[in-house]
């Protein structure tokens, strides 16, 4: 009944109006009691469900304290069901996979399974070898070397930038020209010419994950271990891309294959074959780049050097006079050096020195000044350092039995 009708009734018949109001109040009170009863029922249901949830959470907590079975996801069938393979080598179909949504599971994922029901409790980290995980440099442990710390290698820096840095930071430039960037780079040259330093400077130039391998580390005692390390390293690189894989002293596993029947030689060849397989297993646009370094390029297997694997070869020769001057200035810039030191003369006096020996000259010059209790390093101290390094270079060790 509307407000106008009530007002009209109030004026015509006051008694009927009051009765209608009382009836309306009784109806509202009845509806209020019904709604209050429903509210109480809902509160009771919520309390019961909360108690059930708390009980189930406690059961899950207790179950999580039990040992898990480690298994793999074989197939995700739909949004609820899937097939898992437990470590007991038993495959199980799960109508409901468990606590992890199927949208987060992929075939091959490592998962923790309940030992009785095989339902999935947790998604585990990928199963990489601990040695491979330790080769990844953390963000706070990345190399701090820069190209300014390298002297006499301007052409090599440009070539490495084109092949590695540019393809990771500006891949659209290659797409515009419809060309594929190189997969990897081989740096070769005499020892001490800056190959490892160049790789470290390249890693600091990009925000890519830096995975450092060493050839001797990949030579393992047991059959298949070296190949597994290579396989795990590339799998980890693809997961954490963009990634730079630096393989130092690649000649330890990349030497030319022979007909040797020795077990050790066959294991090294098996490791190299796995490396070749991994180099062929990804495209140059997958944001995984390889930098390899060696001072024995003459013994490397031709299969490793062919195009499509290590596409670009960069030679690191001994520095010339200008390069040696630049290297000496770089290593002496933070030292207390007198203003009259002639680096041109020092560079001419270090004919045949590599970059590491030029650094050693600066160290020996500092030691010579330290012995004389000087506060600054002079030209004569540098000449003494050159003589010291030169004597080590020409010395011969005689062994007597």
UniProtKB/Swiss-Prot annotation:
<dbReference type="GO" id="GO:0016887">
    <property type="term" value="F:ATP hydrolysis activity"/>
</dbReference>
<dbReference type="InterPro" id="IPR012340">
    <property type="entry name" value="NA-bd_OB-fold"/>
</dbReference>
<comment type="function">
    <text>Acts as a regulatory subunit of the 26S proteasome which degrades poly-ubiquitinated proteins in the cytoplasm and in the nucleus. It is essential for the regulated turnover of proteins and for the removal of misfolded proteins. The proteasome is a multicatalytic proteinase complex that is characterized by its ability to cleave peptides with Arg, Phe, Tyr, Leu, and Glu adjacent to the leaving group at neutral or slightly basic pH.</text>
</comment>
<dbReference type="InterPro" id="IPR003593">
    <property type="entry name" value="AAA+_ATPase"/>
</dbReference>
<dbReference type="InterPro" id="IPR032501">
    <property type="entry name" value="Prot_ATP_ID_OB_2nd"/>
</dbReference>
<keyword id="KW-0547">Nucleotide-binding</keyword>
<keyword id="KW-0539">Nucleus</keyword>
<dbReference type="Pfam" id="PF00004">
    <property type="entry name" value="AAA"/>
</dbReference>
<keyword id="KW-0647">Proteasome</keyword>
<dbReference type="GO" id="GO:0005524">
    <property type="term" value="F:ATP binding"/>
</dbReference>
<protein>
    <recommendedName>
        <fullName>26S proteasome regulatory subunit 6A</fullName>
    </recommendedName>
</protein>
<dbReference type="InterPro" id="IPR041569">
    <property type="entry name" value="AAA_lid_3"/>
</dbReference>
<dbReference type="GO" id="GO:0008540">
    <property type="term" value="C:proteasome regulatory particle, base subcomplex"/>
</dbReference>
<comment type="subunit">
    <text>The 26S proteasome consists of a 20S proteasome core and two 19S regulatory subunits. The 20S proteasome core is composed of 28 subunits that are arranged in four stacked rings, resulting in a barrel-shaped structure. The two end rings are each formed by seven alpha subunits, and the two central rings are each formed by seven beta subunits. The catalytic chamber with the active sites is on the inside of the barrel.</text>
</comment>
<keyword id="KW-0067">ATP-binding</keyword>
<dbReference type="InterPro" id="IPR050221">
    <property type="entry name" value="26S_Proteasome_ATPase"/>
</dbReference>
<dbReference type="InterPro" id="IPR003960">
    <property type="entry name" value="ATPase_AAA_CS"/>
</dbReference>
<dbReference type="InterPro" id="IPR027417">
    <property type="entry name" value="P-loop_NTPase"/>
</dbReference>
<keyword id="KW-0963">Cytoplasm</keyword>
<comment type="similarity">
    <text>Belongs to the AAA ATPase family.</text>
</comment>
<dbReference type="GO" id="GO:0005634">
    <property type="term" value="C:nucleus"/>
</dbReference>
<dbReference type="Pfam" id="PF16450">
    <property type="entry name" value="Prot_ATP_ID_OB_C"/>
</dbReference>
<dbReference type="GO" id="GO:0005737">
    <property type="term" value="C:cytoplasm"/>
</dbReference>
<dbReference type="InterPro" id="IPR003959">
    <property type="entry name" value="ATPase_AAA_core"/>
</dbReference>
<feature type="binding site">
    <location>
        <begin position="189"/>
        <end position="196"/>
    </location>
    <ligand>
        <name>ATP</name>
    </ligand>
</feature>
<dbReference type="Pfam" id="PF17862">
    <property type="entry name" value="AAA_lid_3"/>
</dbReference>
